[in-house]
Amino acid sequence: MTDKYIMAIDEGTTSTRAIIFDHAGHKVADSQREFPQYFPQPGWVEHNANEIWNAVLSTIANAFIESGIKPAQISGIGITNQRETTIVWDKQTGLPIYNAIVWQSRQTAPIAEKLVKDGYGDLIHQHTGLVTDAYFSATKIRWILDHVKGAQERAEKGELLFGTIDTWLLWKLTGGATHVTDYSNASRTMLFNIHDLKWDDQILQLLNIPAAMLPEVRTNSEVYGKTKDYHFFGSEVPISGMAGDQQAALFGQLAFEPGTVKNTYGTGAFIVMNTGEKPQLSDNNLLTTIGYGINGKVYYALEGSIFVAGSAIQWLRDGIRLVESAPDSERAARESHNENEVYVVPAFTGLGAPYWDSEARGSVFGLTRGTTREDFIKATLQALAYQTRDVVETMKKDSGIEIPVLKVDGGAARNDWLMQFQADILDTQIMRAANLETTALGAAFLAGLSVGYWQDLEELKASYKPGTSFDPEMGPAERTNLYEGWQAAVKATQVFKHTPYHAGK
């Protein structure tokens, strides 16, 4: 297999990557390209779908150029993507009728709020496993159909198509031949019935979204179509695996057994537990979602979404310029000598699970005249660990399963100080993946399995290499005191609600 490889297209919130893996799961090529973010109004976040497509083509080309690998050597392509982000495009021209509305965007919040006010929150939760929120695709589709002239009528005539990023890229790579999504991405739309495994007619009627614009839903590991030769340098290569980024990371962490939990520290942080072949509906504001469907079976998951994680470190660097780079934050935390009396609650876009408070805003507590730059940076890092504990504690309540080990990956997982504090505040062993590219690797595994590049899950397990572990060192009294302080800070943050004065409005 040395002359054959698997490519993963990892389309994230701020950049796109094309990564080529060999049979041992080693990364042999990696090309990355950022693309613009658009903020038309406060709280709105949009992308240009064609800029994403161009970034994908560019990274594919660069991966081949830099590695010397030929397109014909690629056995299969896996796609993993930022979830929920919504695109509606013209079926004939392939042109989007509006920018992609990003998962972070709050412009559709009034639609979600009206659904809750009208009493539909429980129905949506029971059918989809999700809370009713602007985070998911359903309200974004409705907003586009409402705000683009003639869009509703065109959608009803079958002239428009909807897709999350996976569907858009698959449609483009196959030259418009394949309009398909996978179980994991469908389960994040707030339109998919996770019990029946089909689009939910009641919710479609409720939101007046025409079923004709929705993609076919298929498993996470199968051949959906082949690249057009003009998009892949003369080669028609199977696109053979797809999964939303957090489910791909779960698969890349080889979390095949129920009760296995992983946390990916990216722009946000996403804690996901494999709950097996039956959906476990949360009583505590976690999301019930589909982990992956493979080999005729569907595996479900509980998920806690934290909106701000790595972006808090970016804020330290770019927003208030307390650090020059992400590694500086670890050095600063080690140099802090206070008694952890400072708490930063980074609710820059509200609070995610388990609070789901879209009106909360970031806050700081415990400042004194003696507080230093290092103390503030340390408190910001600690917020990532505290938020993770919020979700893990909730996950244990919902599932009834103890969590002896938390598998971690993502950029902030490189921070040894943070990982040790995470172990301490959870009183749980932290296992950092040897290969932190678990999202792309999960997509590659799904793609490779369906084309026979890897034979089965056992072969993947046999290749697993453990990473670095962090064991708890903090005493129970200190752990309890610190977490109680965090809980008090969150409660105080939720009390403060104020609309700023804007002159002229």
UniProtKB/Swiss-Prot annotation:
The modification Phosphohistidine is found at H231. ADP binds at T13, R17, T267, G310, G411, N415. Glycerol binds at R83, E84, Y135, D245, Q246. Pathway: Polyol metabolism; glycerol degradation via glycerol kinase pathway; sn-glycerol 3-phosphate from glycerol: step 1/1. Sn-glycerol 3-phosphate binds at T13, R83, E84, Y135, D245. It is an enzyme of class 2 (transferase). ATP binds at T13, T14, S15, T267, G310, Q314, G411. Its EC number is 2.7.1.30. Activated by phosphorylation and inhibited by fructose 1,6-bisphosphate (FBP). Keywords: ATP-binding, Glycerol metabolism, Kinase, Nucleotide-binding, Phosphoprotein, Transferase. It catalyses: glycerol + ATP = sn-glycerol 3-phosphate + ADP + H(+). SUPFAM superfamilies: Actin-like ATPase domain. Pfam families: FGGY_C, FGGY_N. The keyword Translocase does not apply. GO terms for cellular component: cytosol. GO terms for molecular function: ATP binding; glycerol kinase activity. The phosphoenolpyruvate-dependent sugar phosphotransferase system (PTS), including enzyme I, and histidine-containing protein (HPr) are required for the phosphorylation, which leads to the activation of the enzyme. One of its GO terms (biological process) is glycerol catabolic process. Key enzyme in the regulation of glycerol uptake and metabolism. Catalyzes the phosphorylation of glycerol to yield sn-glycerol 3-phosphate. Homotetramer and homodimer (in equilibrium). Belongs to the FGGY kinase family. PANTHER family: GLYCEROL KINASE, SUGAR KINASE. NCBIfam families: glycerol_kin (TIGR01311), PRK00047.1 (NF000756). This is Glycerol kinase 1. It comes from Lactiplantibacillus plantarum (strain ATCC BAA-793 / NCIMB 8826 / WCFS1).
